């Protein structure tokens, strides 16, 4: 519903303080990299010109690595990270973070990661074992429960974003100090 749209909204950049642009031929409909520029944007990495050159272009635009769209009134919507985007054989861009957000809000899912395996989308899922146990779901029943969750999820995503398989994990995903999943370990 409409509430889902606003949950992904990032807001507008501040006039006179920061400017933003989307590197896209059609920034309203086609996601592109979000770039920002302004007094409050860094001028570079300390004593690291190579890293600076990788993210700051000659005109001073910081390439954030975030992919998004922007409405005509300037409201930004972040779709996901450029590095995590999955490009399908038919040319569709899949932002796994969007699918993961939906999956993580479903019953019995503690955390998830969507990855490409061959030409299939697989959701790696660490179940909420506390809730699973509380509800009396056995280890033998859990795959069938997750299959029902997969089918429900697939009703909420675009056809090209549908998950082909859920793979259960017995342990939590390895995380960075910021508590982000170390995605690179699971690709």
Segments predicted by a language model, with ranges:
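Conserved ATP-binding/catalytic segment of the ANL
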Residues: 12-18, 26-29, 33-88, 105
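Conserved C-terminal "lid"/linker of ANL adenylate-forming enzymes
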Residues: 111, 119, 150-187
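Short, small-residue-biased leader/transition segments that mark boundaries at the very start
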Residues: 1-6
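Adenylate-forming
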Residues: 41, 75-102, 131-141, 159-164
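Generic structural signal for well-ordered beta-strand positions
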Residues: 30, 71, 77, 94, ...
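Residue-level signal for inorganic ion chemistry
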Residues: 74, 103, 123, 166, ...
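C-terminal boundary motif of the adenylate-forming
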Residues: 67, 72, 105-129
